[in-house]
Amino acid sequence: MTDKLIIRRTIAEELAQILALYPLAFPDEELRPVVSRLIEGEAQVLSLATFKGEALVAHVLFTIFGSEEDKGAGALLAPLGVVPDHQGQGVGNALVKDGLKRLGAMGVRQVFVFGDPAYYGRFGFKTERQVLTPYPLSEEYGDDAWQSMPLAGRAPLAAGRMSLPEPWMEPALW
């Protein structure tokens, strides 16, 4: 019998499992400090994980924020990690879709991501030019890597710079 995949909000006791996932999913990046600070800190986040039995096989973090010009709710999708033996099986897709649905129910108006346009475009993300990141972006995915998507027909955030919690205020993260 195979274990069914379950997506749910994480709890504080699962932080060690969450942090163990990221070096496997991103061996060339050190994401554990920002993930830990966001989950344990005072930032408003939506932390979701996919479990296969007791094993955490994927995690996504959405940080809720406003912008300089608009205090309306936006969310930053980052990071999203899937353990290597579950990549390419739709686990990340299901996790993102679940998160977008939950964010819509929470009243979030627009979700932002910095990543591969081919991957995130399948969810409806499009290049973003109005709401700016706190620091210049790396050239990893080109000019179209900064993307956003309004939720449930809601109006997008006003143009301006994102106002993110302190853990995201590290230039190296961008």
Language-model features: locations:
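C-terminal "cap" of GNAT-fold acetyltransferases
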Residues: 135-174
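Conserved glycine-rich acetyl-CoA-binding loop
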Residues: 55, 69-70, 83-94, 106, ...
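Conserved beta-strand segments that form the floor/walls of ligand-binding pockets within enzyme
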Residues: 49, 61, 76, 81, ...
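A short beta-loop-alpha structural element at the N-terminal edge
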Residues: 5-18
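A short, glycine- and basic residue-enriched loop/turn
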Residues: 68-69, 74, 117
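Active-site rim helix/loop that mediates acceptor-substrate recognition in acyltransferases
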Residues: 15, 20-53, 57-66
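Conserved active-site alpha-helix within GNAT-family acetyltransferase domains
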Residues: 105-109, 115-142
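Conserved acetyl-CoA-binding loop-helix of GNAT-fold acetyltransferases
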Residues: 77, 82, 88-101, 113
